[in-house]
Amino acid sequence: MDIKNKNLTELNELCKQIRERILEVVSQNGGHLSSNMGAVELIVAMHYVFDPDSDPFIFDVSHQSYAHKLLTGRWDEFSSLRQLGGISGYTKPKESKFDYFVAGHSSTSISLAVGAAKAIKLKGENRIPVALIGDGAMSAGMAYEAMNELGERKYPCIIILNDNEMSISRPIGAISKYLSQMMAGEFYQKFKGRVNQLLSYIPDGAAYMAKRFEEGFRLITPGMLFEELGLEYIGPVNGHDLADLISAFKVAKSMKKPVIVHTQTIKGKGYEKAEGFDEHWHGVGPFDLQSGEPKKHAKRSATQIYSEALLNLAAKHKNVVGVTAAMPTGTGMDKLIEAFPERFWDVAIAEQHAVTSMAAMAKEGFKPYITIYSTFMQRAYDQVIHDLAIMNLSAVIAMDRAGIVGEDGETHEGCFDISFLNAIPNVSMCAPRDEQSFKDMIEYSYVHEGLLAIRYPRGSFILHEQFKDAPKISRGKSVLLRENKNAKTALIGYGNGVGRAYEVSIKLDFETDLIDLVFAKPLDKEFLINLAKKDKIWYIFSDSVKKGGIGDILSAFLQENKIYDVEINTFEYDDKFLPHGKTPDVEYFLGLDIDSLAKKILNDKKY
């Protein structure tokens, strides 16, 4: 959509239409609402001042990119947002040439902008990278690593800081407000450059005094940090005033330097129920536009079970501590932080720091619970090895959102943790099958010596109370949930895969043995060797990738124990990234729904 010839009135009307479209679709499909509603004017101004055909538009995390999608030819397709085969909720180059880079994890945008700026310079092109990053993403060290180099190299680059919670800086009284407005003006930027030129002609003493005055001046302005890093600073700018935004972006573009444009916006702008700081409206399911109430009431989730179980554990043991990285509500850790603020912390987007700080607490005799989404644990892999495993410390890594996460898609799938953690010495891995086993697992985790990784799904467990009388958790022990003495086939489940195996066994009239592996590491050697003597065909059910997954782990076990007469078939994910869409739709697409799985086993005619 070409908007460069529109006047201000027309642009404001366009912003209104974009908000209406976002509300219409997100209320039907779910998605990231408040961040997108708050960024509409920013993105319209970006498209007005810069050239989306040539300038790389880089969205940090990119869950604020809906307006960008609507402005780049996806208005009609937008109704398929986050559906299987439809528009992604994040930027995706395969979807549109206007999506410069895949995004979904935080704080990558400035590094990408630096790399793009280097490439543009080497190619001798007249383009400029434009990165849009939120104040939350600015809490991660990677953003500062990138700004540190950018300030040194001075590549032309625009960083738009979307400060939608005012957590970085607030205007300090009338003086600061005046200075901020002045700094956003073209006159000030030209004046500042001219003054710097004139200062070079002043005698050394006077120049030194002028320099000290300038430093003092910056101490009472919000841009001090960024200017100390070597970046030019414009702002704060009202992120909902198109005239101010366009003016500030034009000034930034003309400077041919690395520039931070600090904008302040309101999350949820334009939808009264979402305006402000309510985290509930960040990511939402389908909801009623009039009431704001969700259209479906979710079943009791694994996250709720974990939160309540850990709350009970922390009430009993004063050495239980915990941390999450910018996901207190999503992980259920908000309840712990509220109940025990001196023992549970949200450290913002800082997974590496979260792990290492808890390692020191484990060393001091505390029992840390590091509660992070499976996909984000990838960001702290080195710290798990270097600071927890090598030290052989007793801590718990609780990984929420393991397996298919549905609509968020490939950047958020929690399917790699088994593979990357299994390779690390001194790590034990287990997964609950249902609510009762999860509660037992949390109780067990407190007495477990060493590093224990627990994975659990987004949403609810497939199983409920079918096996409430099963044995309690014991280190490295698997459980035979249902035995068929005549069977030669075993369905082996891990985590939520046990529920899938159980439902398949119903389709097969229970003519198989049903096993809950419980521990992927250490394995229950005696149990598995005895199982191999009876059952010669094993079907594996796990929400994980095949490479390095449960099937590979069990195949390696059989090889190591010289057991060559057992056939393993694994229902895990192939070596490709998973599509976004509702979880049942994705499972059906992959052939991992219950009917398809049962049919595959029946067609084998071996069981």
Curated annotation (Swiss-Prot):
GO molecular function terms attached to this record: 1-deoxy-D-xylulose-5-phosphate synthase activity; magnesium ion binding; thiamine pyrophosphate binding
Record: residues binding Mg(2+): 135, 164
Gene3D superfamilies: 3.40.50.920, 3.40.50.970
Class in the EC hierarchy, top level: transferase
Annotated Gene Ontology cellular component terms: cytosol
EC number from the UniProt entry: 2.2.1.7
Reactions it catalyzes: D-glyceraldehyde 3-phosphate + pyruvate + H(+) = 1-deoxy-D-xylulose 5-phosphate + CO2
Keywords on record: Isoprene biosynthesis, Magnesium, Metal-binding, Thiamine biosynthesis, Thiamine pyrophosphate, Transferase
Pathway in which the depicted protein is active: Metabolic intermediate biosynthesis; 1-deoxy-D-xylulose 5-phosphate biosynthesis; 1-deoxy-D-xylulose 5-phosphate from D-glyceraldehyde 3-phosphate and pyruvate: step 1/1
SUPFAM superfamilies for the chain: Thiamin diphosphate-binding fold (THDP-binding), TK C-terminal domain-like
Origin superkingdom: Bacteria
Cofactor note: Binds 1 Mg(2+) ion per subunit.
Protein task: Catalyzes the acyloin condensation reaction between C atoms 2 and 3 of pyruvate and glyceraldehyde 3-phosphate to yield 1-deoxy-D-xylulose-5-phosphate (DXP).
Protein name per the record: 1-deoxy-D-xylulose-5-phosphate synthase
Gene that this sequence comes from: dxs
